[in-house]
Amino acid sequence: MLPANFEDDASYDECTDDLNRVCADLANAAEDTGIALATISDNNIFFETKREYAKEMVTGFIRLNGMTVGAVANRSKVYDAEGNAESYEQVLTVDGCKKAADFINFCDAFSIPVLSLTNVTGFEATLEAEKDMARAVAKLTYAFANASVPKVNVIVGKAVSYTHLRAHETLAN
């Protein structure tokens, strides 16, 4: 699924999956986007990275029509094998931003396109997070803006925008 080095192009393999298949349970996977990523990928294979770190942000690799794609998504629930759910707020966290930024930089270094699924209502609002949030969000923003690979974002729920931050009023002054 991954290239051996940055010059290798092992990111494409023949697609054996039906591209016109119906993803019946996709609507139910908005909370745990790891399930959504597995559902949309070729042969339902999702290779998750850093599974135990910043669980509210999922990163990993999927194949779409045979091409390796890096996937980044935030999630509000994580389901285990027995169907038990661990819940998270729909916010960006410091660790989640760092995890996503590092993953995007990795994908860019190996020329792997990035797909992101977004369902976030804001930023973590704790005293501890307040110290590092601006730096972490800036790192994530820079990683997305600086990456030279194709990037596609799909909003699967809510998303924070300039309107939410009231930037339109600040920038107008």
Feature locations, PLM:
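Amphipathic alpha-helical segments at domain termini/boundaries
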Residues: M1-R63, V69, A73
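A glycine-rich phosphate-binding loop feature that marks nucleotide/adenosyl-phosphate handling sites
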Residues: N5-D17, K55, L117-E124, V156-Y162
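Long, structured protein-protein interaction/assembly regions in large complexes
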Residues: E48, Y53-T68, V72-A109
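Generic beta-strand/beta-sheet core signal
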Residues: N65, V72-N74, F110, L115-T126, ...
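Short glycine/threonine-rich loop-to-helix capping motif typified by GTGT followed
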Residues: N84-S87, E124-V137
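Secondary-structure transition/capping motifs at alpha-helix termini
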Residues: N105-L115, Y142-P150
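Glycine-rich and small/hydrophobic secondary-structure elements
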Residues: K131-N153
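Conserved small/polar residues in nucleotide/adenosyl-binding loops
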Residues: T163-H164, H168-A172
